[in-house]
């Protein structure tokens, strides 16, 4: 074991330090010339040790710099990819919104105003018809429903009485029935039917 330890020390230490340590062990006392020579050798030994340490540190430093550069390149490429992807998404959203606005505006300016009113009027008419059905049925009689069933095929009467009046009939009984149905709160229904 004692023989292996000096061999390991010799491998770890530079040769100048090994020579100096062995020289100090072998020589118990030396002259001034020996001290000067050992001092000069010590200076060169320090430079040799510094060079070896610098070489080892420089190699590790170069490796560290290379690894950091590669890591920075990867991070930079990923960040630019994500930024570019976000910009493309924003551009697509803007283009889609512009196309939607163009289609919307062209549909409204190109004569789409009247069909929209026509589309909205029947829905409003349906709501008012459903809301006012009990009132209309309360004021109208079943005889009016039979006379006005053939008035307009577009409207469906869900109650016992049809809200639109029949065409003008020469008999006074038909005119009276039409006036009684017109006086009911279903006048809005007639207006929505006429508008649509």
From Swiss-Prot:
**Span list, region Disordered:** 93-184
* Transmembrane helix among keywords: yes
**Pro residues: bias regions:** 161-171
Q: Where in the cell is it found?
A: Membrane
List all membrane-crossing ranges.
61-81
Q: Where is the composition biased (Basic and acidic residues)?
A: 95-106, 124-135
Q: Membrane topology type, per the record?
A: Single-pass type I membrane protein
Any single GO CC term annotated in Swiss-Prot or TrEMBL for this entry: membrane
- Is Hydrolase included in the keywords of this UniProt record? no
Ranges in the Extracellular compartment? 24-60
Signal peptide coordinates? 1-23
Glycosylation (residues): 19, 26
Q: Where is the composition biased (Low complexity)?
A: 172-181
Record's InterPro entries? C11orf87
Look up the domain of life of the source. Answer: Eukaryota
Regions annotated as coiled coil:
none
Q: Which residues lie on this side of the membrane: Cytoplasmic?
A: 82-196
Record keywords: Glycoprotein, Membrane, Signal, Transmembrane, Transmembrane helix
Q: What is this protein called?
A: Uncharacterized protein C11orf87 homolog
């Amino acid at each position: 074991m004692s023989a292996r330890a000096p061999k390991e020390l010799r491998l770890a230490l530079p040769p100048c330090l090994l020579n100096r340590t062995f020289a100090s062990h072998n020589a118990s006392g030396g002259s001034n010339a020996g001290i000067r020579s050992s001092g000069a050798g010590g200076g060169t030994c320090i430079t040799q040790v510094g060079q070896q340490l610098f070489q080892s540190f420089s190699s590790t430093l170069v490796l560290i710099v290379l690894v950091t550069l590669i890591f920075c390149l990867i991070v930079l490429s990923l960040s630019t990819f994500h930024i570019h992807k976000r910009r493309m998404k924003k551009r697509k959203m803007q283009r889609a919104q512009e196309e939607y606005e163009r289609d919307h505006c062209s549909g409204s300016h190109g004569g789409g105003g009247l069909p929209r009113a026509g589309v909205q009027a029947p829905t409003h008419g349906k709501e008012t018809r459903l809301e006012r059905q009990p009132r209309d049925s309360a004021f109208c009689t079943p005889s009016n429903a039979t006379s006005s069933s053939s008035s307009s095929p577009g409207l469906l009467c869900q109650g016992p009485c049809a809200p639109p009046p029949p065409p003008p009939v020469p008999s006074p009984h038909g005119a009276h029935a039409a006036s009684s149905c017109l006086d009911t709160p279903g006048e809005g229904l007639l207006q929505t039917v006429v508008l649509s």
